């Protein structure tokens, strides 16, 4: 389950502040920026040296750039006016860029009929107004999905709505008026799905104070399994702002995200049980659709699932693709990583998606023909990036192309036959990835071939699922 917060920070920012400024105000802003980046962008403050490099080091600059890119700001790497203003804006406290170890697996409800109960009522509003605001917030999501929500007055509900102040039993205390607005938990048992609202805020039905309906729509999105969107028009965008509730609508991005988890309103069939539909990991006939590294992890894609294998560790976890990337399709057919850029490319049919820091980039998918493929190429079977040559190899049927990532163009003289230049590797490759110890791992059906690209020969034949201790 993912713990989520909304922060409402009232300080104001002024001036563009270089990271090496020595004034008290500038240092206060830098310290505030560090705390912000630690919370939302994974800045490891303990690793920063306790010197002026703390304020000018590349690590913090990179995190500022990461934040600016995600939130649609001009990427300067500095704590300039617009960046500080965004840092002080009302927002949700879940990190904008996740390290995968922090992500829950498959955070969706495995049923279409979900109950909620309002545990207690804020004195700021009439009970009827609270009931109406919460009911309408749930209705926003039921209008675009097959989900049905029912309010119960007693007993155990799937989602519990609570108004509380200070420490309230979940190890995530509220901090009084003007700080944390609310938090929620992702789908699951126990506290899973519950939404908590800070009683020290002044809850309202209008633009004054804090609008309960708008806050609840955002929090319920998290309760249903949605993360944040980088689309500023989306209700799931990290920052909070009031909009006219009479004309409020979910954005296209919100709708795509929630429907990727639950389908559209016409899909009233029971959600598949993952115990029945998840491929058996140690099935000797198991094959994969795509495989790629992501940092020190290996992702194995199959249908709507992926397995996550951390290098040198025996433990493996299986997740829904939609749990990490709600807007992406199932059935990923090829994938590769450029680790130095924190980029992953995912392919299906004649389209591809770009993932940066585990977040989908806007304005995707794009056509695979933008790489320079001829029109007769309709899909990519497999792809792999070699950092030694800074080239990506694309495998299609019995041929392969080589792409120069620096010049952003295909190398001349391609395509070439796979069998001619990859001795022992046959056509129709299912998946391939590169290992830092000089090997390609080619997957064909239930078999896997360790290939030394320096010696240009197969060095080992394995089962495709040998990475999992099968």
Curated annotation (Swiss-Prot):
Main location class: secreted
An example Gene Ontology CC term for this record: extracellular region
Keyword Repeat attributed: yes
Signal peptide, first to last residue: 1-16
MF annotations from Gene Ontology: calcium ion binding; collagen binding; core promoter sequence-specific DNA binding; endopeptidase activity; metalloendopeptidase activity; sequence-specific DNA binding; serine-type endopeptidase activity; zinc ion binding
UniProt cofactor(s): Ca(2+); Zn(2+)
Tissue-specificity statement: Found in alveolar macrophages but not in peripheral blood monocytes.
Gene3D superfamilies in UniProt: Collagenase (Catalytic Domain), Hemopexin-like domain
An annotated GO BP: protein import into nucleus
InterPro entries the UniProt entry points to: Hemopexin-like_dom, Hemopexin-like_dom_sf, Hemopexin-like_repeat, Hemopexin_CS, M10A_MMP, MetalloPept_cat_dom_sf, Pept_M10_metallopeptidase, Pept_M10A
Binding site for Ca(2+) 2: 158, 190, 192, 194
Protein name as catalogued: Macrophage metalloelastase
Classification of source organism: Eukaryota, Metazoa, Chordata, Craniata, Vertebrata
């Amino acid at each position: 389950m993912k713990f989520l917060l909304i922060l409402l920070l009232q300080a104001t920012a002024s001036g563009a502040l270089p990271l090496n400024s020595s004034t008290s105000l500038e240092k206060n802003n830098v310290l505030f920026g560090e705390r912000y980046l630690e919370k939302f962008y994974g800045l490891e403050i303990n690793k920063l040296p306790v010197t002026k490099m703390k304020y000018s080091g590349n690590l913090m600059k990179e995190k500022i750039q990461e934040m600016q890119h995600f939130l649609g700001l001009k990427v300067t790497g500095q704590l300039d006016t617009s960046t500080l203003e965004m840092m002080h804006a009302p927002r949700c406290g879940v990190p904008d860029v996740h390290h995968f170890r922090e992500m829950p697996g498959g955070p969706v409800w495995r049923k279409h009929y979900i109950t909620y109960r309002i545990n207690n009522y804020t004195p700021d509003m009439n009970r009827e107004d609270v009931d109406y605001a919460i009911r309408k917030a749930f209705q926003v999501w039921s209008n675009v999905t097959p989900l049905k929500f029912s309010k119960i007055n007693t007993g155990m509900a799937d989602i519990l709505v609570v108004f509380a102040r200070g420490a309230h039993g979940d190890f995530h205390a509220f901090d009084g008026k003007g700080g944390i607005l609310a938090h929620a938990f992702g789908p699951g048992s126990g506290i899973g799905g519950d939404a908590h609202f800070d009683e020290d805020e002044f809850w309202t039905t209008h633009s004054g104070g804090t609008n309960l309906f708008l806050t609840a729509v955002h929090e319920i999105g998290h309760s249903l399994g949605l993360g944040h969107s980088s689309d500023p028009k989306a209700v799931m965008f990290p920052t909070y702002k009031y909009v006219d509730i009479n004309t409020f609508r979910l954005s296209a991005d919100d709708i795509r995200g929630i429907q990727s988890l639950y389908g559209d309103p016409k899909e009233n069939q029971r959600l598949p049980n993952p115990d029945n539909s998840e491929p058996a990991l140690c099935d000797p006939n198991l094959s994969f659709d795509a495989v790629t590294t992501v940092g020190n992890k290996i992702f194995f894609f199959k249908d709507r699932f992926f397995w996550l294998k951390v290098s040198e560790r025996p433990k493996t976890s299986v997740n829904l693709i939609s749990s990490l990337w709600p807007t992406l399709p199932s059935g990923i057919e090829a994938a590769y990583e450029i680790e130095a850029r924190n980029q992953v490319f995912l392919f299906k049919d004649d389209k591809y998606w770009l993932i940066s820091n585990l977040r989908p980039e806007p304005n995707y998918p794009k056509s695979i023909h933008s790489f320079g493929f001829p029109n007769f190429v309709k899909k990519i079977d497999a792809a792999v990036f070699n950092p030694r040559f800074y080239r990506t190899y694309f495998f299609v049927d019995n041929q392969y192309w080589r792409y120069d990532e620096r010049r952003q163009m295909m190398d001349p003289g391609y395509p070439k036959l796979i069998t001619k230049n990859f001795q022992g590797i046959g056509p129709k490759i299912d998946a391939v990835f590169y290992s830092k110890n000089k090997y390609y791992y080619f997957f064909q059906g239930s078999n896997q071939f360790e290939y030394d690209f320096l010696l240009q020969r197969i060095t080992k034949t394995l089962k495709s699922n040998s990475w999992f201790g099968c």
